[in-house]
A protein has these predicted regions:
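P-loop NTP-binding module
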Residues: 1-188
Length: 188
């Protein structure tokens, strides 16, 4: 669905404000963002596992105002790490350091990881790709929205062919098609 692409671009745009922005790869199973940025050698998993005491040594500056905290080595116990006190402490610290934190994680319906993360985010963004979501699925998305389960739920429609006049399918990439935003700016 282009989740990682969309998150990277929104984060880069927000860093131009100027704002202090972090891309946080919490896809502890595939590390899609880390791989896209060629940053898969060290990262947040080592901090969450207790192998590293200072997560700052794993944060890489991409450009002025924009940094990334990659996954690093994929852990065998992603959900357990996300339920840990170290994860809570990490998020509290990052929230104080950054204006916006964009979290890339697996889809909600595949593994428990994303459901754990949604409890601490300020906004949940579903990335959907034009041509992949059957419009008959829209009532389910509307139900999710009205349930209030996701904080400030939003949808980004990606991959729209503006030349096409075809209707009936909207984008929802099954698999890695969700992104999560986390910010503490008063301008939101």
């Amino acid at each position: 669905a282009g989740k990682t692409f969309v998150i990277q671009n929104i984060a880069a745009s927000m860093s131009l404000k100027p704002s202090k922005v972090l891309l946080l790869d919490l896809d502890l199973r595939k590390a899609t963002l880390s791989k896209a940025l060629d940053k898969d050698h060290r990262g947040v998993a080592a901090y969450l596992n207790g192998k590293v005491e200072d997560y700052h040594e794993h944060i890489d500056v991409i450009s002025e105002g924009l940094s990334v905290l990659p996954v690093g080595k994929l852990p065998p116990n992603p959900a357990e790490l996300l339920l840990s006190d170290r994860f809570q402490s990490l998020m509290e610290s990052l929230k104080k350091e950054y204006d916006y934190i964009f979290i890339d994680c697996p889809p909600i319906d595949i593994v428990a990881d994303a459901a754990i993360v949604t409890k601490i985010v300020d906004m949940t963004v579903f990335i959907v790709r034009a041509g992949l979501l059957d419009k008959r699925s829209l009532p389910l998305i509307e139900t999710l929205y009205h349930s209030g389960k996701y904080n400030r739920m939003a949808i980004v429609l990606n991959g729209v062919d503006i030349e096409s006049r075809r209707y009936g399918n909207y984008g929802y990439g099954y698999g890695y098609g969700y992104g999560y935003g986390y910010g503490n700016s008063s301008e939101e």
